[in-house]
Amino acid sequence: MGKNGSLCCFSLLLLLLLAGLASGHQVLFQGFNWESWKQSGGWYNMMMGKVDDIAAAGVTHVWLPPPSHSVSNEGYMPGRLYDIDASKYGNAAELKSLIGALHGKGVQAIADIVINHRCADYKDSRGIYCIFEGGTSDGRLDWGPHMICRDDTKYSDGTANLDTGADFAAAPDIDHLNDRVQRELKEWLLWLKSDLGFDAWRLDFARGYSPEMAKVYIDGTSPSLAVAEVWDNMATGGDGKPNYDQDAHRQNLVNWVDKVGGAASAGMVFDFTTKGILNAAVEGELWRLIDPQGKAPGVMGWWPAKAATFVDNHDTGSTQAMWPFPSDKVMQGYAYILTHPGIPCIFYDHFFNWGFKDQIAALVAIRKRNGITATSALKILMHEGDAYVAEIDGKVVVKIGSRYDVGAVIPAGFVTSAHGNDYAVWEKNGAAATLQRS
């Protein structure tokens, strides 16, 4: 192929990669679970065989596990950040191949960035593990105890700055106010982009450092998106269920987005407010899915362009099951997030292991076919204990819940295009006709 032809192909691929982001059509996919590191032959190699199915389902971004050496097998206790070959998921060459395969299908790769804390390779003169090795032959990321927050007294030498966020007891909390820490972490993030091919970030335990510090790393590395895990407890009643009013919870998430730069920033948050409310709502309390202003009750209702919605992830579900979605109602959860505003995230387990691949893909197809975006208009038509019905952009209607007699609230001119266990989706006649012809 000539030079001009190669340039043309590259430009087309770049347009494909950027299309979802520019238009708000992102559909995320978490490409691992808590047990993925155990995969025989390596997780990255196994995932090579899943790329076609993921891309065919309309996914725009795949979130991959932490890429570096880690004291814990899962990757969340990182040490030598440049040492990719030591990962339990596979080596650097295998990771590059996987990212290349994703890019070849127009799908971006999200790196799981764990920078709140870090594990040291060596002890200092006190016998404390606080001497860090970066994983290169030079001094990059080779830090000492003066890079550990001084209020992390178990590890620090007392000379650094105070922690800007929540404590992480299991490993040293890194001083993100330190100029060298900021500079070398930004260099590492840029290397993840330039050398490995990553496009975007998922910020692990983002409560551990201030949003102002997150802004430094987002602004300094220009990811296509940076979705943060800011997981706080929800206010609950005496029965253990979440209170109806979760405005304080979602306000905290909105505040994080504001402080990293708001609409101008690539920063966004996982919508833990929606997750918690939806968990409870599908148990016969679907009245929860509307706030007093008639909007969705999570971050989705206030700032949908910055709300990454999800049913479960490697922490809430998988084998950890810290906060699992009701297992017999998972597809109700997907019917909700895949038809609604916000940026939905599909979990690997539900797609590949639970037998929901075709149903989830059908819902994504409806989303794409009707041009539903992160900021689509939501009109809630019914919100009772056993039935929730909503219209999106005047093009799609969705019902979740056990009640079947909801025909009276379905607008004229809509026909059923997807249905399953206690959920159904309708499209306008024109969209349904297009589906039948295709």
Curated annotation (Swiss-Prot):
Alphabetical keyword list: Calcium, Carbohydrate metabolism, Germination, Glycosidase, Hydrolase, Metal-binding, Secreted, Signal
Effect on the protein upon substituting residue 302 to A: Over 10-fold decrease in affinity for starch granules. Abolishes binding of starch granules and reduces activity towards starch granules by 99%
Enzyme Commission no: 3.2.1.1
Catalytically driven reaction(s): Endohydrolysis of (1->4)-alpha-D-glucosidic linkages in polysaccharides containing three or more (1->4)-alpha-linked D-glucose units
Effect of residue 315 to N: Loss of activity
InterPro entries the record matches: A-amylase_bs_C, A-amylase_pln, Alpha_amylase, Glyco_hydro_13_cat_dom, Glyco_hydro_b, Glycoside_hydrolase_SF
Pfam families hit by this protein: Alpha-amyl_C2, Alpha-amylase
Effect of residue 404 to A: Reduces affinity for starch granules 9-fold and reduces activity by 90%. Abolishes binding of starch granules and reduces activity towards starch granules by 99%
Cofactor(s), by name: Ca(2+)
Origin superkingdom: Eukaryota
Reported impact of residue 129 to A: Reduces affinity for starch granules 3-fold
SMART domains, A to Z: Aamy, Alpha-amyl_C2
Binding site for Ca(2+) 3: 152, 167-168, 171, 173
Function of the molecule: Alpha-amylase displaying a robust amylolytic activity toward p-nitrophenyl maltoheptaoside (BPNP-G7), amylopectin and beta-limit dextrin.
Subunit structure: Monomer.
Note: There are at least 4 types of alpha-amylase in barley.
Name of the molecule in the record: Alpha-amylase type A isozyme
